[in-house]
Amino acid sequence: MKILGVDSSGLAASAAVLSGDTVVAVFTVNNKKTHSQTLLPMIKEVVDFSGIPLEELDAIAVAAGPGSFTGLRIGSSTVKGLGLVLDKPIIPVPTLEGLAYQLAESDGFICPIMDARRNQVYTGVYEMREGQMVEVMDQCAMDIHDLLKAVSYTHLTLPTNREV
């Protein structure tokens, strides 16, 4: 399956093309420009670099949140437009689950965190069971200090998308 993936949920924006389990091309931008300025040019570059034409894609995936409200709107509206024009299905991917999958080979619980501002983080707890990512604690926004008190440090990995 060939998929274009787009994430504009945080300060950085990313676009990637996957063919099966292989990341063919990836492009990440973390500069002062807004996602509305960078997302379409990034998508064009990553698709061109991958050598897989947009028409050959099987689906388009988009980070579905939590995250920056404006960034999520820009990403979802961009992907929705592409999906309509190309007649491709759209796959919403929970942002925290996407972060957790980066550590799918880890033992124990995975607790991704994203800065939600004002000493808050977006978080959830996941665990790999029989090759499947399982949500152990629902995604939520909470005080970073409450999270640190609540989690056990045994077999816990904390992937983040930036410093908190």
Feature roles, as predicted:
Residues L11, G65-P66, A116-N119:
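Short glycine-rich anion-binding loops that position phosphate/pyrophosphate groups of nucleotides
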Residues M1-A64:
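N-terminal beta-alpha supersecondary unit
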Residues P89-L158, R162:
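Surface "functional belts" at beta-alpha junctions
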